[in-house]
Amino acid sequence: MTNMNQANHDRPEPEGNPLPWDDIDTAAMPADQVVSALEARLREDIENIGRDETEHDGVKPVEIYDRAYECKVLADSVSPEGARLTTMEVTFPRIILAEMNTHRVFSRNSASSRAIPIKKRIEMVKKHPYVPEYWGKLQKWMAADEQIDRELRQQAKETWLDARDHAVKYAEELAILGIHKQTVSRLLEPFLWQVAIISSTEWDNFFRLRTSPAAQPEMRAIAELMQEAHEISVPNEVKPGEWHLPLVKYEEKQEIPSEDQPWVSAGRCARVSYMKQEDERDWHKDRDLCQNIAKIGHRSPLEHVATPLEDASEWSGNFRGWKQLRKTMPEPSSQT
């Protein structure tokens, strides 16, 4: 990944902090070392860029960098029978969202091009665009195990950012015409970072497939961060009748009635579609939001919240050993 000013010295200096890998010469590295080198630099810079030290049920988030590859454990729980459920908030290039969505054992909600105002989307693309850090050479098969020549990589970066500039230009023109953001935002998606909340009891196959050298570099980068976060996180024991509650802080549990806590948690997971989780919020509004969207059939956020089953091998939806909040209410005829 590169800073916009690096890619073309005629471009204005973007606002915000320089990216942490600007001084790494990826051109001089073998292809199989590029992603590892970038991840190592990101981890080195954790203390310099700061972390959100807020604990959610005793779990401290793993936060790597703002608007770059990032993984944060929001909640990590284990049942008395040993079934583990983990919820993460991850940030990755939107270009791999389709691949991320192929994993059916994941429950997920993510930032929506239909929900986020086009002005904010354009600002994101201008200030912090996604730019590939690995430029694979055209060849047969799915994996590019060799980069293009060093002198061509800078041209590739400049061409990519030229495409970004054109996308912004035409998005702005469509917005002026009064076109809805659900259409205009599509022009910007190749250059966007995607934020998603993912919950699962089954991670091994994902880690095996997506951390492989054959995986697309962008997918491998975020998958390795997710695997590391999963390995170092220590789950809290949750008993039957209690709940796995992403985004509900320990101190909030003293204020929020126990019967409302699952709805508050699910409501906050739903809000990832259009707001940052660190934004100030009112738990009453989160509860009401969740209950309202559930009534009209938008129930995917209710999958992140779950309570242990007595049998750790029993399935509830796509979770094993945990019953999802979604499964506690009858499904409408039309569901999302």
Q: Where are the language model's segments positioned?
A:
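A conserved ligand/cofactor-binding region detector
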Residues: 2-336
